[in-house]
Curated annotation (Swiss-Prot):
SUPFAM superfamilies: MurCD N-terminal domain, MurD-like peptide ligases, catalytic domain, MurD-like peptide ligases, peptide-binding domain. Keywords: ATP-binding, Cell cycle, Cell division, Cell shape, Cell wall biogenesis/degradation, Cytoplasm, Ligase, Nucleotide-binding, Peptidoglycan synthesis. ATP binds at G108, A109, H110, G111, K112, S113, T114. Its main location: cytoplasm. Pathway: Cell wall biogenesis; peptidoglycan biosynthesis. One of its GO terms (cellular component) is cytoplasm. This is UDP-N-acetylmuramate--L-alanine ligase. It is found in: Cytoplasm. One of its GO terms (biological process) is peptidoglycan biosynthetic process. PANTHER family: UDP-N-ACETYLMURAMATE--L-ALANINE LIGASE, UDP-N-ACETYLMURAMATE--L-ALANINE LIGASE-RELATED. It holds the Pfam family Mur_ligase_M. InterPro entries: Mur-like_cat_sf, Mur_ligase_C, Mur_ligase_C_dom_sf, Mur_ligase_cen, Mur_ligase_N, MurCDEF_pg_biosynth, UDP-N-AcMur_Ala_ligase_MurC. It is an enzyme of class 6 (ligase).
């Protein structure tokens, strides 16, 4: 049995790969800088996890796979190289992991986790590797003895080009992670074209500015024409979106917002290649959402607290639109957004867009930037967000939130945005 060690195993994407290979019969170990919910869960699943990194952790290993966050000076990476152990980045390891599978890969700047998750609910015989926790299964990985595998493909480091898709879905091709592409949008778009070209079946959002010009044969969704009568409702505080798709009738999906209808439509059009429409309509009801995507942590008649992974203006704007609809349906009079900016480079590149995205909220609270390893960039955020409340920290007290300056947030709809620590802050109760 091959011994595989993962450096940075606590990451949402790389932990899914570790889980998948463990199910395939490999002996898995891993390490990370600090303990987390994911590392604790992995240990319960029988994975030996070492905290922090130490060179001895890679002794007697046949292969080392490391996350994108790992630098060359990492003691385990350095020692593995010295010992001649084969080292692969997550990106380089994908062909090895996916080699014998029929891959249904979902890419795009926004909506890929949701679209992947919905597709996984529809294709219930497929294994799943995604960068989010499916509430239906309580994991970012599902292993099935099947040739089919639903995979969330990442364009940020061009690793989606290593996914060898049988079916490829692209939700949109908005410019994100341009630093990896030499700040040239044309290189990013060329990568998307390569990703699509490899696939036998292609499903695209044909109203995306780039994708609408894609030349090869594909199944095209024109959201403004194909999605009709999109309505939202709340049932026992749970959000649902209903819509009609082309001439296929009505569908109902867990979650709130037009973007949910769009993501679900792409998954439905993909699944139609393998399933009949009534099976799809029924299985769509199994989908229960994903963690950190309009994730309702507490709800009663006076207060609803929501955690959302949104960290780009486009995502935030779409989710706030859904939040406004939820507040209207639920009778919540005030909307408070708590924003933890993720990466200085993203914040600096999209300052005006972020300001615009938050225009509809009654109160905006801004936490310090989650740097994700980046060097700080000097930004005058108070000039861009003159009405915002800037706080050093926020913590959960029972069902309420308390800011470091003493402010208490206890009514209306409160929604947190960010890809850093904010989710933990919103979830860690101090009773």
């Amino acid at each position: 049995m091959q011994n595989i060690h993962f450096i940075g195993i606590g990451g949402i994407g790389i932990s899914a790969l570790a889980r998948f290979l463990k199910e395939k019969g490999f002996k898995i170990s891993g390490s990370d800088l600090k303990e987390s919910k994911i590392t604790k869960e992995l240990e319960k699943e029988g994975v030996k996890v070492s905290i922090p990194h130490h060179k001895d952790n890679i002794l007697n290993k046949d292969l080392v796979i490391y996350s994108a966050a790992i630098k060359e000076e990492n003691p385990e990476f350095k020692h593995a190289k010295e010992l001649g152990i084969k080292c692969l980045s997550r990106k380089e390891a994908l062909p090895l992991i996916l080699e014998d599978k029929r891959v249904f890969a979902v890419a795009g700047a926004h909506g890929k986790s949701t679209t992947s998750s919905i597709l996984a609910s529809l294709l219930d015989d497929a294994s799943v590797i995604i960068g989010a926790i499916l509430k239906e299964f309580g994991s970012n990985m599902i292993y099935k003895e099947s040739q089919n595998l639903v995979f969330e493909a990442d364009e940020s480091d061009s690793s989606f080009l290593n996914s060898n898709p049988y079916l490829a879905i692209v939700t949109n091709a908005e410019a994100e992670h341009l630093d990896h592409y030499g700040n040239e949008v044309s290189k990013l778009h060329h990568a998307y074209t390569q990703f699509l070209d490899v696939a036998k079946i292609r499903v695209i959002n044909a109203e995306d500015e780039f994708l609408k010009n894609y030349k090869n044969e594909s199944i095209k969704l024109y959201p403004s024409k194909d999605i009709k009568n999109c309505t939202m409702c709340i049932e026992n505080f749970k959000p649902f979106t209903s819509f009609e798709l082309k001439d296929l009738g009505e569908f109902k999906v867990f979650g709130m917002g037009y973007h949910l209808a769009l993501d679900a439509s792409l998954a439905i059009l993909a699944a139609l290649n393998f399933l009949d429409i009534e099976t799809i309509r029924t299985r769509l009801k199994n989908y229960q959402g994903i963690k950190k995507r309009f994730d309702i942590l507490h709800a009663d008649e006076n207060l609803v607290l929501i955690d959302d992974y949104g960290h780009h203006p486009t995502e935030i704007k779409a989710t706030l639109s859904a939040a406004q609809e939820y507040a209207k349906l639920g009778g919540y009079k005030k909307i408070t957004a708590i924003f933890e900016p993720h990466r200085y480079t993203r914040l600096a590149a999209n300052l005006k867009e972020f300001a615009k995205a938050f225009e509809g909220v009654d109160e905006l609270v801004i936490l310090p930037v989650y740097a994700a390893g980046e060097e700080p960039i000097e930004l005058d955020l108070k000039a861009v967000f003159p009405k915002a409340l800037f706080v050093e920290d926020i913590k959960r007290e029972g069902k309420f939130l308390v800011a470091s300056k003493g402010q208490v947030f206890e009514e209306g709809l409160i929604i947190g945005f960010g890809a850093g620590d904010i989710s933990n802050k919103l979830r860690q109760k101090n009773e």
